[in-house]
Amino acid sequence: MRLISPALVVSTAIQARHVNSSAPVDSAMTEANPLASAHPPDVGYDGVPAGRVRNPDDPTTEERTPGESFMEAINFKIFKLVQEAQGRILGLPEQPRGDMEWLERYGQDAILHYLETGDKDPSQLEKKYDQLLDELKNAPNLEVEILESIHALFLAYMEEVAKPAVQTTPKLNEQPDKFAWAMINKARRNAKPGIRNPYKSLNIPLVENYIKKYNAFIELRQRELTLLDTFSCAFNHNTVKLAKFLAMVDTFSPKRTFVLAMRIELSEIWIEEKRTIAEVASILGISTITGYAKNRLSAGTFVRFIYQLAKTNEQLGPDIVKDLVKTFGPDRTTELLTRMKTVSPRMFTILKDHMDVRLKETGVTPN
């Protein structure tokens, strides 16, 4: 089934400006992106901007505003997809896909023009997409997950165009996994010198939602290590947000390399900030028994912090164990040290020996 390409939607989306902006499309963008019309298939396409008559020599062609063209395009998409589902149910032969090819090629430009002119209530766009999803939820073999992804991306798109601080200059061949990084980069670059925390200009829930929907980090492959500094700078080393974000990313098990690299990054920041073990445990939400049980993924980050801390000076071993026992108690400390085996068997042995010595001093028999 042919669907609007999320990558193309992202490329177009990043180009959008404020919803209420009346500025014309940049000429460079128009030259790079031939999507210069939002007219539906019955009107045709000849490179004339939406809202103008397609053919001045043909008075029968109807003038449409960008918003009207967009709504018509979405209605048309719903109709075609539902018609396709019905045809499959009834065993009808597949219809030619020329109309859907048109929508895939030109539909995004209608969105761009619609959002630039703001001539209709943007909430109507969300309703239209919701309607599309509702009608297709129970239709067989329509790749509803893809539709939901398009829906989520478009909602993110609508939200972002109202935030100039997080827009970026696009490249038409950009892949979806670059979208979150583009927003982060832009937030960092556009932060005023007087604002110590550029993160405030970044819509964290939106970025989280984007990554949840598209698993952007899964596609980063070898690029993650070169982007860690950018990522950290964007949050201005706000380790509370970084830790929360990492816990969410850690649910993407295939991205072990990124998770490990970010844990190292966080640990080094905390060490530079001279954070105590108790402070880091609090940041990660694992300082209490209940919090520890709920945030076991964050405990992995904590173990990495302990390893990095001990590696900087192995003479700190006894003090580290003392603080661990004070913060977590002997049982949870033992569990944390056991997890150290997967990080560094050698460091596990060193800290476990210190732990055994401490337990003997307090009259407790080591395990």
Swiss-Prot record:
Disulfide bonds: none annotated. Glycans are attached at residue 20. Induction: Expressed in spores as well as during host plant infection. A motif (dEER) lies at residues 61-64. GO terms for cellular component: extracellular region; host cell. It is found in: Secreted; Host cell. Its main location: secreted. Residues 33-65 are annotated as: Disordered. Residues 1-16 form the signal peptide. It comes from the Eukaryota. Keywords: Glycoprotein, Secreted, Signal, Virulence. Residues 54-65 have a biased composition (Basic and acidic residues). Belongs to the RxLR effector family. Secreted effector that acts as an elicitor of hypersensitive response (HR) specifically on plants carrying defense protein RPP5. Has the canonical EER motif, but lacks the canonical translocation motif RxLR, which characterizes most oomycete effectors identified so far. The EER motif is not required to trigger an RPP5-dependent immune response. The ATR5 effector protein is a polymorphic member of the RXLR class and displays copy-number variation among different isolates of H.arabidopsidis. This is Avirulence protein ATR5. The gene is ATR5.
